[in-house]
Design a protein with these regions (language model features):
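Glycine-rich hexapeptide-repeat left-handed beta-helix
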Residues: 2-14, 58-60, 66-67, 72-86, ...
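Right-handed parallel beta-helix/beta-solenoid
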Residues: 30-33, 50-55, 81
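Short, conserved beta-strand segments within well-ordered enzyme catalytic domains
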Residues: 36, 42, 48-50, 57, ...
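Glycine/small-residue-rich loop that forms an oxyanion/phosphate-binding "nest" at active or ligand-binding sites
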Residues: 89
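Short HxH-centered metal-ligating active-site micro-motif
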Residues: 93
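Extended, small-residue-rich solenoid/repeat segments and analogous flexible loops
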Residues: 1-48
Length: 182
């Protein structure tokens, strides 16, 4: 299924100087200097990035959809106000209304809509988290796994072509957002 083209105006989106990055003017970020982005990142409306807590780094072609909340994970229960940096790997898609508080999100990862990834979770490369899934604290999602449920359970495995699919999907999603002057 091909994604439809979405047309937005320059009054709604802006480009970042470094690379080809599209940021919604409605996104909310705290301490943007603590948020590192690479080429072809797309941050949609009303997302919240908590760069005031610890460093957040997004590799190439990370898609953050509407109303997603991304913040670094608490270090551990004994140090309640210490946060760990969050690294999001290349070609990763995070769906609408998802809340992410992980230690790591690997490459070629798909996280569906309305998902919650709790503190200190680790998502390895090539993982799919289905819509409406809750991943409890300290859980590690293994490579090529498909997870679903409340709490998340392994329900299947991705094939070894997932990285090619996610690369195509994320590039297509990014390219289909066309920003035009009014």
């Amino acid at each position: 299924m091909e994604l439809p083209e979405r047309i937005k105006s320059t009054s709604e989106y802006r480009f970042v100087d470094k690379g080809n990055v599209k940021l919604s003017k409605l996104m909310k970020s705290v301490r943007m200097n603590q948020i590192k982005v690479r080429d072809k990142n797309l941050f949609e409306d009303n997302i919240i990035l908590r760069g005031d807590l610890a460093l957040i780094s997004c590799e190439k072609c990370v898609i953050l959809c509407e109303n997603a909340i991304i913040h670094p994970s608490l270090n551990n229960i004994n140090a309640p106000y210490e946060y760990r940096p969050l690294h999001i790997g290349k070609y990763t898609y995070i769906g609408k209304n998802s809340i992410i508080s992980s230690l790591k999100i690997g490459e070629y990862v798909y996280i569906g809509e309305n998902c919650i990834l709790s503190d200190r979770t680790k998502v390895e490369n090539n993982v799919k988290v289905m819509d409406n899934t809750y991943v409890p604290s300290d859980m590690e999602l293994v490579e090529y796994g498909i997870y679903e449920g409340y709490p998340a359970k392994l329900i299947g495995h991705l094939d070894n072509q997932n990285s090619k699919y996610m690369e195509f999907f994320c590039n297509d999603y990014f390219d289909k957002l066309v920003i035009k002057k009014k």
